[in-house]
Amino acid sequence: MDKDAIESSIIIDLFKEEYKLDFEALNLQWIKKYFRVEEEDRKILESPQSYVIDRGGQIFFAINDGKAIGTAAMVLVEERIFELSKMAVEPKFQGFGIGRRIIDECIKFAKQHEAHEIFLITNDKLLPALELYRSSGFELDENYDDNRY
């Protein structure tokens, strides 16, 4: 695939009901590959409108030829604090800068909503994602302890 052609054909769109199944499928693909699907995953993936949008967050989609090939959610955790969550890019489209474009839109959204903190929770198994997050300005919090994972 031609990287320039792919990059120029991608549009970033906001959550629509028609993308709901794509949000779930894109995320289940990587979650099942590396981990197990947790109850919290199921809630957000099956009901993104109520768990993200209705609570003041947003879900972004990378669209190529009318198909959702990438996604990420900005979840409002508490006033002015957002979590970047449920980020996924279709494997055959990874490495084309799509994840970066989605993250950039997520950060822009948080800034527009006067966020004073954006965080994400990830796993060191996801090396390409870790590098993407670091290069997007995220920093490792050595003191953070999440015993869910």
Question: How does the language model describe each region?
Answer:
Residues M1-S8:
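Basic/polar N-terminal segments that are highly enriched at the extreme N-terminus
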